[in-house]
Amino acid sequence: MGIDASIRNQFPILDQQVNDRKLVYLDSAASSQKPLVVINAIDDYYKTIHSNVHRGVHTLGTRATDAYEGARENVRRFIQAQHHEEIIFTRGTTTAINIVASSYGMEHVEEGDEIVVTYLEHHANLIPWQQVAKRKKAKLKYVDLTADGRVTVEAVEAQLSDRTKIVAMAHVSNVLGTINPIKEVARLAHARGAVMIVDAAQSAPHQRINVTDL
């Protein structure tokens, strides 16, 4: 059995035919399929562990809390964060960005300030900042792309000013797969006193992430 077949066999949803052909799924950028190890872990949780976390001292409550905090520690190690307190669980990237925009954005962006985004952004990393800019009477600035769909450090720098408060950028484009130079952009943003917000939904599953280094 080749490595491709071995990996495919870990995804039971692919063991079916569509239009008389073996199913090939190419929409993982929107919603990824789950391997057996994940399906089995979720199944085991609901069969043997499920309870409220951080709410009770009974056996199931303790098991659920341990599993919950264990998952937080696994994520911390996976993205190489320094402290487990840095890891906050949400329903997904869209919800997470909306929370940041409606809390940090609404608190720290003032009239006349600037928010910088790129033309590569998923709507989840665009619409929340449009809303913040509109409500706070701030300016939303867009970074142009090269002819082949890339974001350059120079193009980002051209949009920064002393009024820049937030730079929001995808690490990897969900449409083109373009890898953006977020480390260099973060350095420029911080030099201006701005906060860098990275949408890493497409990069974290496919490349090594070190949020401390970024």
Predicted regions and their residues:
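Pyridoxal 5′-phosphate
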Residues: 1-214
